[in-house]
């Protein structure tokens, strides 16, 4: 694990009179996270099923840290793509050109792609954005004078922009985990990159991701799906996501009341997702989670992608957060799933020694995919069909 003692001090120092409380919270949270029994490599039993102790821990806590999933080679591929992506970012939120005057990344998009924030800000908390699910505003520390006025902290539709992220999306062991949790006909959700630069990265206020099924008669702990969070530089108590263990089973939570009872945004019992480079977290979308502004010295780059049970999205009207609200029929789900087919093909080309994942809905329809220029054109604005619930 990374030594983040200097980052803890730097972060706490920005909280003024609450510095000691913040320092204690970060240290205690890190210790509590590492004491949980929900960390280790992906394991399957003799019959090929996901190990029962992983299923049990995921059900108990609402998240599990899979260690050492991405090889150094794969991490380096993502890193190289990130250098190119950042160079192509627009120079400002309302700009269509990059620093070299070229058309900026996503300038021809019909869908949202970059979410911006002021340094160390909380652009979502306490607003009606994302259906108002970010109920409270996080503390926004004062950034230093040399930081930009705004910077991107989320890239949506990331598989279109990064071949390396597309290939990670098709990681065979992760897809086997998705099948174990959501069934062999699991459906895609949404993909994004979360960019938390040191001294700049924005907060994401406490929230639960699900919006559609809270009052469903079929409600269960997995009805809103999950996200995989692959960590390029690791994840810490300072720059990482915090989760309230077990909260995925509690239904819709009154976050304002919880913050009030905790007497601050430092929610009691929450723990950070502590990860090393190449680790991947599976996190239930119903779990209460959020992150503080990155006031430390370590960057975080999270390759985020999620999956649903097909029964959670088929003939269901979407929540309208990641895409326009629409009723998801078989055609829409199939159209949105084609990105997975291209991802499997792209990964097979890059890592031919691996046994590629077999996605049963493709097999049943005798579908095959090739990753080429035509495929690249086919996934332009693919996230218009994000299965957002």
Regions found by a protein language model. Name each.
Residues 136-139, 208-211, 256-269, 299, ...:
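Short, surface-exposed loop/helix-turn segments at secondary-structure junctions
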Residues 163-166, 177, 214-218, 230-232, ...:
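Short helix-to-loop capping/linker segments positioned immediately adjacent to catalytic or ligand/cofactor-binding
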Residues 192, 197, 208-210, 230-234, ...:
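Short, structured patches in soluble enzyme cores that scaffold and shape functional sites
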Residues 205-225:
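Acidic, His- and aromatic-enriched active-site or binding-groove loops in soluble protein domains
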Residues 222-226, 233-292, 312:
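Double-stranded beta-helix
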């Amino acid at each position: 694990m990374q030594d983040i003692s200097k980052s803890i001090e730097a972060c706490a120092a920005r909280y003024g009179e609450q510095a000691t409380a913040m320092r204690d919270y970060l240290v205690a949270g890190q210790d509590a996270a590492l004491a949980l029994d929900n960390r280790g490599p992906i394991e399957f039993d003799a019959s090929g099923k996901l190990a029962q102790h992983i299923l049990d821990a995921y059900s108990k806590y609402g998240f599990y840290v899979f260690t050492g999933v991405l090889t150094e080679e794969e991490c380096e591929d993502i890193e190289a793509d990130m250098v190119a992506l950042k160079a192509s970012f627009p120079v400002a939120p309302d700009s269509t050109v990059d620093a070299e005057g070229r058309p900026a990344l996503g300038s021809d998009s019909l869908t949202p792609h970059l979410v911006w924030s002021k340094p160390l800000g909380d652009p979502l908390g306490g607003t009606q954005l994302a259906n108002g699910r970010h109920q409270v505003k996080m503390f926004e520390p004062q950034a230093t004078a040399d930081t930009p006025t705004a910077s991107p902290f989320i890239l949506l539709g990331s598989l279109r922009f990064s071949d390396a992220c597309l290939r990670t999306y098709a990681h065979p062991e992760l897809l086997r985990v998705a099948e174990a949790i959501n069934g062999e006909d699991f459906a895609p959700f949404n993909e994004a990159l979360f960019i938390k630069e040191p001294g700049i990265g924005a907060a994401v206020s406490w929230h639960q991701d699900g919006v559609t099924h809270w009052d469903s008669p079929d409600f269960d702990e997995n009805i809103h799906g999950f996200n995989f969070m692959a960590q390029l530089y690791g994840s810490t108590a300072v720059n990482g996501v915090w989760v309230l263990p077990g909260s995925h089973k509690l239904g819709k939570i009154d976050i304002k009341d919880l913050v009030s009872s905790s007497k601050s945004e430092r929610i009691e019992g929450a723990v950070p997702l502590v990860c090393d480079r190449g680790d991947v977290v599976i996190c239930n979308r119903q779990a209460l989670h959020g992150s503080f502004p990155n006031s430390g010295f370590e960057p975080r780059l999270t390759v985020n992608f999620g999956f649903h049970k097909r029964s959670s999205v088929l003939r269901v009207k979407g929540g309208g957060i990641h895409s326009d609200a629409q009723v998801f029929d078989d055609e829409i789900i199939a159209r949105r799933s084609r990105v997975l087919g291209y991802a499997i093909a792209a990964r097979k080309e890059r890592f031919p020694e691996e046994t590629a994942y077999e996605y049963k809905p493709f097999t049943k329809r005798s579908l095959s995919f090739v990753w080429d220029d035509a495929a690249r054109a086919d996934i332009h604005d693919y996230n218009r069909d994000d299965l957002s619930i």
